[in-house]
Amino acid sequence: LDLAIENLQTQNNSSSMRVHKDVARALKAEIALFEATWEKYHKAKNDAFYDKTVTDEKIKSYFEQCVAACKDVVDRNVWQIYSTGNKLDDYRKLFQTEDLSSNPEVLWFKHYDGANIGNNVNRYLNQGGGGAGVTRSLVDDYLTIDGKPFTGAQVLAAKRVFGDELKPTLRDPRLSQTVCMPGQV
Protein backbone atom coordinates (compact mmCIF):
# COMPACT_ATOMS: atom_id res chain seq x y z
CA LEU A 1 0.00 0.00 0.00
CA ASP A 2 2.88 2.38 0.61
CA LEU A 3 3.93 1.88 -3.02
CA ALA A 4 0.37 2.56 -4.16
CA ILE A 5 0.18 5.70 -2.02
CA GLU A 6 3.45 6.89 -3.50
CA ASN A 7 2.40 6.30 -7.11
CA LEU A 8 -1.33 6.99 -7.26
CA GLN A 9 -2.69 10.37 -8.28
CA THR A 10 -4.04 12.92 -5.84
CA GLN A 11 -7.72 13.77 -6.25
CA ASN A 12 -9.90 16.38 -4.63
CA ASN A 13 -13.23 14.62 -5.17
CA SER A 14 -14.55 11.15 -5.91
CA SER A 15 -16.24 11.94 -9.22
CA SER A 16 -13.87 9.81 -11.32
CA MET A 17 -14.64 6.63 -9.34
CA ARG A 18 -10.93 5.72 -9.59
CA VAL A 19 -8.59 4.66 -6.82
CA HIS A 20 -6.39 7.55 -5.68
CA LYS A 21 -3.90 8.30 -2.89
CA ASP A 22 -6.50 8.95 -0.21
CA VAL A 23 -8.35 5.70 -0.97
CA ALA A 24 -5.08 3.80 -0.53
CA ARG A 25 -4.37 5.71 2.68
CA ALA A 26 -7.83 4.87 4.03
CA LEU A 27 -7.35 1.21 3.17
CA LYS A 28 -3.94 1.22 4.85
CA ALA A 29 -5.47 2.77 7.97
CA GLU A 30 -8.23 0.17 8.07
CA ILE A 31 -5.83 -2.75 7.65
CA ALA A 32 -3.36 -1.37 10.21
CA LEU A 33 -6.14 -0.75 12.75
CA PHE A 34 -7.52 -4.26 12.25
CA GLU A 35 -4.10 -5.85 12.62
CA ALA A 36 -3.18 -3.76 15.67
CA THR A 37 -6.38 -4.53 17.53
CA TRP A 38 -6.33 -8.20 16.50
CA GLU A 39 -2.80 -8.63 17.79
CA LYS A 40 -3.49 -6.59 20.93
CA TYR A 41 -6.46 -8.71 21.95
CA HIS A 42 -4.94 -12.08 20.97
CA LYS A 43 -1.57 -11.82 22.67
CA ALA A 44 -2.40 -13.99 25.68
CA LYS A 45 -0.45 -17.25 25.57
CA ASN A 46 -3.59 -19.31 26.05
CA ASP A 47 -5.33 -17.62 23.10
CA ALA A 48 -5.79 -19.89 20.07
CA PHE A 49 -4.41 -17.14 17.82
CA TYR A 50 -1.41 -16.29 20.00
CA ASP A 51 1.76 -15.50 18.02
CA LYS A 52 4.91 -15.12 20.11
CA THR A 53 6.63 -13.11 17.36
CA VAL A 54 4.20 -10.21 17.79
CA THR A 55 5.64 -7.68 20.22
CA ASP A 56 4.10 -4.64 21.87
CA GLU A 57 6.35 -2.52 19.65
CA LYS A 58 4.93 -4.17 16.52
CA ILE A 59 1.38 -3.57 17.74
CA LYS A 60 2.24 0.06 18.51
CA SER A 61 3.71 0.39 15.01
CA TYR A 62 0.42 -0.77 13.44
CA PHE A 63 -1.53 1.78 15.51
CA GLU A 64 0.94 4.51 14.50
CA GLN A 65 0.63 3.59 10.82
CA CYS A 66 -3.15 3.81 11.12
CA VAL A 67 -3.00 7.23 12.76
CA ALA A 68 -0.46 8.54 10.24
CA ALA A 69 -2.51 7.39 7.24
CA CYS A 70 -5.67 8.97 8.68
CA LYS A 71 -3.80 12.18 9.48
CA ASP A 72 -2.53 12.39 5.89
CA VAL A 73 -6.11 12.22 4.59
CA VAL A 74 -7.53 14.64 7.17
CA ASP A 75 -4.70 17.17 6.84
CA ARG A 76 -5.46 17.64 3.15
CA ASN A 77 -8.75 19.30 4.17
CA VAL A 78 -10.51 17.89 1.12
CA TRP A 79 -12.91 15.38 2.67
CA GLN A 80 -15.49 16.16 5.32
CA ILE A 81 -18.35 14.49 7.14
CA TYR A 82 -21.54 14.63 5.08
CA SER A 83 -24.04 16.90 6.77
CA THR A 84 -27.07 18.86 5.71
CA GLY A 85 -27.54 19.94 9.31
CA ASN A 86 -30.20 17.32 9.98
CA LYS A 87 -28.47 14.75 12.20
CA LEU A 88 -31.69 12.71 12.37
CA ASP A 89 -31.63 12.01 8.63
CA ASP A 90 -28.10 12.65 7.26
CA TYR A 91 -26.79 9.12 7.87
CA ARG A 92 -29.76 7.53 6.07
CA LYS A 93 -29.41 9.93 3.13
CA LEU A 94 -25.74 9.05 2.82
CA PHE A 95 -26.81 5.50 1.88
CA GLN A 96 -29.89 6.42 -0.15
CA THR A 97 -28.26 8.92 -2.48
CA GLU A 98 -27.97 7.63 -6.04
CA ASP A 99 -25.13 9.93 -7.09
CA LEU A 100 -22.29 10.16 -4.57
CA SER A 101 -19.90 12.03 -6.87
CA SER A 102 -20.37 15.36 -5.12
CA ASN A 103 -20.55 13.98 -1.57
CA PRO A 104 -17.60 15.41 0.41
CA GLU A 105 -17.41 12.32 2.67
CA VAL A 106 -17.10 9.70 -0.08
CA LEU A 107 -13.53 8.96 -1.16
CA TRP A 108 -14.42 6.21 -3.61
CA PHE A 109 -17.65 4.71 -4.89
CA LYS A 110 -19.18 2.68 -7.67
CA HIS A 111 -21.97 4.32 -9.62
CA TYR A 112 -25.25 2.41 -9.84
CA ASP A 113 -27.94 3.64 -12.18
CA GLY A 114 -30.53 0.91 -11.73
CA ALA A 115 -31.12 0.40 -15.45
CA ASN A 116 -27.63 -0.59 -16.55
CA ILE A 117 -25.47 -1.06 -13.47
CA GLY A 118 -27.01 -2.44 -10.32
CA ASN A 119 -26.69 -5.23 -7.82
CA ASN A 120 -28.50 -8.35 -6.67
CA VAL A 121 -28.63 -7.50 -2.99
CA ASN A 122 -32.36 -8.30 -2.70
CA ARG A 123 -31.79 -11.73 -4.22
CA TYR A 124 -28.95 -12.48 -1.82
CA LEU A 125 -30.87 -11.30 1.24
CA ASN A 126 -33.99 -13.31 0.42
CA GLN A 127 -32.47 -16.68 -0.53
CA GLY A 128 -33.44 -19.47 1.82
CA GLY A 129 -36.50 -17.69 3.18
CA GLY A 130 -34.54 -15.07 5.08
CA GLY A 131 -34.88 -11.36 4.77
CA ALA A 132 -33.08 -8.18 5.55
CA GLY A 133 -32.83 -7.58 9.24
CA VAL A 134 -30.46 -6.70 12.02
CA THR A 135 -29.36 -8.71 15.00
CA ARG A 136 -29.83 -7.83 18.65
CA SER A 137 -26.03 -7.72 18.86
CA LEU A 138 -25.85 -4.96 16.23
CA VAL A 139 -28.48 -2.89 18.01
CA ASP A 140 -26.69 -3.37 21.33
CA ASP A 141 -23.41 -2.17 19.81
CA TYR A 142 -24.77 1.34 19.24
CA LEU A 143 -23.77 3.67 22.07
CA THR A 144 -26.03 6.05 23.96
CA ILE A 145 -26.37 9.67 22.90
CA ASP A 146 -23.58 10.61 25.34
CA GLY A 147 -21.17 8.04 23.86
CA LYS A 148 -21.43 5.41 26.59
CA PRO A 149 -22.41 1.73 26.25
CA PHE A 150 -26.13 1.00 26.44
CA THR A 151 -26.25 -1.08 29.62
CA GLY A 152 -27.90 -1.53 32.99
CA ALA A 153 -31.04 0.26 34.12
CA GLN A 154 -31.17 2.28 30.89
CA VAL A 155 -31.68 -0.92 28.91
CA LEU A 156 -34.42 -2.24 31.17
CA ALA A 157 -36.29 1.07 31.12
CA ALA A 158 -36.03 1.45 27.34
CA LYS A 159 -37.11 -2.13 26.59
CA ARG A 160 -40.38 -1.70 28.54
CA VAL A 161 -41.93 -0.03 25.49
CA PHE A 162 -41.11 -1.62 22.13
CA GLY A 163 -38.92 0.67 20.08
CA ASP A 164 -37.94 3.07 22.86
CA GLU A 165 -34.40 1.72 22.88
CA LEU A 166 -34.02 2.87 19.25
CA LYS A 167 -34.96 6.50 19.84
CA PRO A 168 -32.35 9.03 18.65
CA THR A 169 -32.88 11.01 21.86
CA LEU A 170 -31.46 8.04 23.79
CA ARG A 171 -29.07 6.36 21.36
CA ASP A 172 -26.59 7.33 18.64
CA PRO A 173 -28.89 8.86 15.97
CA ARG A 174 -27.40 6.55 13.34
CA LEU A 175 -29.22 3.60 14.96
CA SER A 176 -32.67 4.98 14.16
CA GLN A 177 -31.46 5.54 10.58
CA THR A 178 -30.16 1.97 10.27
CA VAL A 179 -33.18 0.00 11.51
CA CYS A 180 -36.88 0.51 10.96
CA MET A 181 -38.48 2.33 13.84
CA PRO A 182 -41.99 1.46 15.03
CA GLY A 183 -44.45 3.22 12.73
CA GLN A 184 -42.09 3.38 9.74
CA VAL A 185 -43.09 1.59 6.57
Please provide the spans of the model-predicted regions.
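Flexible helix-coil transition and linker loops at the boundaries of alpha-helical arrays
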Residues: 7-18
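An aromatic- and glycine-enriched ligand-binding surface/loop that stacks and positions planar moieties
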Residues: 18-22, 30-185
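Glycine-rich, acidic and aromatic/proline-enriched surface loops and short helix-turn segments
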Residues: 1-7, 27-37
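Long, amphipathic alpha-helical regulatory blocks in the mid-to-C-terminal portion
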Residues: 1-9, 69, 75
